[in-house]
Structure formats: C-alpha cells, structure tokens
Amino acid sequence: MNEFRTRLAETRPDEASASGAGGLDFASDGQGGDLPEAALVTGGAGFIGSHLAGRLAIDGDVRVLDDLSTGDRDAVPEAATLIQGDVTDYQSVVRAAEGVDVIFHLAAVVSVEESVSDPVETNLTNVDGTVNVLEAAREVGARVVFASSAAVYGPPETLPVTVDEPQTPRSPYGASKAAADAYVRAYEASYDVPTVALRYFNVYGRGQRGPYSGVIDAFLGRALDGEPLVVHGDGEQTRDFVHVSDVVRANLAAATTDDTGTAYNVGTGRSVTVNELASIVAAAADVDAEVRH
C-alpha cells in the first residue's frame, strides 16, 4: 500500500508555478545555500509544515511551533526543535521566534467543514493567530511567509485564477484566510515587516491524512481496497492540484525574494477534472478501478 501511495504522490499533472507580481524564482529553492540560517515553522507537525521543516532542517536551525491538536509529533524532523504551543498565545509565539530570520506561518484551522461548525474558533486561530505571528516577527525582526489559500477567491470568475481575482470567499475558512492575507500585506505597508502570502491551491503528496485530506487520498484508499471510485455529479468539476514538494519550493523562494508585501498563487495553472483524476489514481495504483457517478 505504501508503494502505491508513493507512486501517486510522485505523479504530477504539471509542474507548479507561483504567479503574482513578477512571479517567484523557483530556482532559488535553497539548493544554492540561500536557506535561512534559523527559521520557525508554525504548524510544522502538519502535512505541509512537516515537509517544509524537513527541507529546512537539512542546512539550518529549525524550530516547529505546533499544539499537536491535529499535527503528528512523529512527522516533525528529528533535526528540528519541537515547541508545543498555540499561535493564539502571543508569548508562546514570540519566545519560539526569538533569533529566527524567517517565520513560515502554516498553523491554521484548515477544514472548511470545521470552520462552518465553529467559525469563532476558526477566526481565533486563523486571524488572531496570524496577527500574533506578525507582531512577533515585528518584535524579533523576522520575515513572514504566510500560508494563504485559493479559498480567498471563492468561485473563480476566470481560469486560470490570477492574484487580482475578486475575493468572494464562501466559507468561514476562506473568509479567515482572506482577512489574515490582508493583515500580512498590511504589516509590511504599516510596519516594514517583510511578508509574502502564498495562496495554495489543492495540495497533495505523501503524509496527507485525516478525514479532510482530499479527494486524491480518498480515491486512492478506495482503489487499493478494491472499491469503486465515487464521483459526485458528472465529474467535470475541476481542481488545480499541486504537489507538496512544489509548495515547499515556493516557500523557500518566498523566504529570499526581494518582491515582498505581495501575494502569489501556488498551483500548476492547469485544471484537472475529477474524471481525469480518477483515471490518474487508478493508473498510479495499477488497478482496474470502477468509476461510479
């Protein structure tokens, strides 16, 4: 099973890009020794955060701030220092950030369903927690690279989505990310805190887990269990899927870019239908899976 999951995780419909005001240079991904010497990753025990912390830990001093409410302690790289704490507690954040060059802020309520059931907690973590991170960065003199989301746009008016697309979020999650995204850019404009907001599209890869881990993981689990892949509707609805390793590269590029105070979309720029995705999953799992609408 792990072999099949790995095979799918390495399957990419297209190479990713980060589009915005001039774009990010993905060649500047830390391979040339330009990684920050000391970094803090909030939410570093989660899916994307643990991948990022693992890359940063190769060459530098990495701290992970995570309350482990949804993160996995075992996902934190051995070379990283785990600080168990919550971004809603300012003192925990500023202590963890002391002496770092960059704060990669990924800690968040990430489930749309959870945000609908508890919008107050979502706002506390995603908005107030982000302001705490920005204040800590202001105090210690660090850059902030913020994990925003394509959910800030709501249903897109045009494809591919550009960073200038009107923001009409349709969930408390999307609204909280839009508010935090605005705070991130406002802190650079108001306080000269260098910031970059990265608006992730649908991220997939190894280590993704949980009830809201995404359609790719759900399809793969059913394929490996010999069950039909259930597609809701006609299957022609589209998503932009981006591999977690490309998201890591975007974060590393954002840590060194001179073009701060702005936002970038992180995706492939290509829409994949759910029907196409079902075929990709079946091929990756090497099974003749039934697709049921």
Regions found by a protein language model. Name each.
Residues 101-104, 145:
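N-terminal Rossmann-like NAD(P) cofactor-binding module of classical short-chain dehydrogenase/reductase
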Residues 117-132, 143, 151-197, 202-204, ...:
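Catalytic helix-loop patch of NAD(P)-dependent Rossmann-fold dehydrogenases
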Residues 83-84, 124:
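Conserved residues in the N-terminal Rossmann fold of short-chain dehydrogenase/reductase
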Residues 39-58:
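N-terminal Rossmann NAD(P)H-binding glycine-rich loop of SDR-like oxidoreductase domains
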